[in-house]
């Protein structure tokens, strides 16, 4: 499995299409600048890739609304759940390595893994972890990792008895916890933590030198966009920048900055 076509989807990419005509970059520039205002965003970085080559890039807005530093094409953003694509890619690499198979039961590699239903526990496959169809409702269990210091196994074990809302593989339910389980699976099979495996097998081979899986590593970089929040989540309130939170318990589901 090639890494490059998978990770191409992670970039902020606008396709140039198949037409030989020169695109109107001035119109695109105006569109992007307007998007920052229209959607009330602190900043935005856009890149256009054609045939594997970066043909245009530009930054808009500010890294921090309280300061003047502008977003550039090289600005680092917290990419949140786009981190899941890296996790799926890492699982795919292990499949290619012959270390596991998509249809392997999760308990084959993680005997301690449990769900509230013994049948689901026995039949949950590797691919099920990535498909948001476990039976839990969207965001079920997220309060176990957000703002806590629980480690990943503890999070999964604490959540194991939470009743399913849907039948197994019957309904979509967006699950951060199943991607946390996927991160634990990567460690169980490879002997390396999720962050170490992603760094060694994906980031380094692709030369992604301005991508980090550790929030603490952002101290080594400049040109970093800060997250922003509205007071009381009031849509009419002004946005304020906030400090990055360490979300180690959610590795696999989130955590990458790029």
At which residue positions do the language-model features occur?
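Bacterial N-terminal signal peptides that target proteins for export
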Residues: 1-7
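Bacterial N-terminal signal peptides
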Residues: 8-17
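Short, conserved catalytic-motif segment at the N-terminal edge
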Residues: 23-77, 99-101, 108, 151-153, ...
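A generic alpha-helix surface/boundary motif
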Residues: 30, 88-89, 104, 180, ...
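Short active-site loop at a secondary-structure junction
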Residues: 38-45, 66-129, 164-177, 251-254
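Short, surface-exposed loop or secondary-structure junction motifs
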Residues: 64, 118-258
């Amino acid at each position: 499995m090639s890494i490059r076509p998978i990770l191409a989807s992670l970039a902020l990419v606008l396709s140039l299409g198949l037409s030989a005509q020169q695109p109107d970059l001035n119109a695109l520039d105006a569109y992007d600048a307007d998007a920052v205002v229209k959607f009330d965003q602190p900043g935005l970085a856009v890149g256009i890739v054609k045939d594997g080559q970066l043909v245009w890039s530009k930054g808009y807005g500010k890294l921090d609304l309280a300061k003047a530093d502008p977003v550039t094409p090289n600005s680092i953003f917290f990419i949140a759940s786009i981190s899941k694509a890296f996790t799926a890619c890492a699982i795919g690499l292990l499949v290619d390595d012959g270390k596991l198979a998509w249809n392997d039961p999760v308990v084959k590699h993680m005997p301690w893994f449990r769900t509230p239903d013994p049948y689901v526990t026995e039949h949950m496959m590797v691919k099920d972890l990535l498909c948001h169809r476990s039976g839990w409702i969207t965001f079920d269990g997220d309060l176990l990792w957000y703002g806590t210091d629980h480690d990943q196994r503890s999070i999964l074990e604490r959540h194991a008895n939470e009743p399913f809302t849907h039948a197994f593989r019957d309904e979509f339910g967006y699950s951060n916890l199943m991607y946390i389980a996927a991160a634990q699976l990567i460690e169980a099979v490879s002997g390396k933590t999720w962050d170490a495996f992603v760094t060694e097998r994906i980031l380094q081979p692709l030369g992604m030198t301005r991508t980090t899986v550790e929030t603490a590593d952002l101290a080594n970089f400049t040109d970093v966009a800060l997250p922003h929040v509205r007071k009381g989540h009031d849509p009419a309130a002004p946005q304020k920048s906030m400090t990055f939170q360490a979300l180690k318990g959610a590795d696999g589901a989130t955590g990458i900055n790029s």
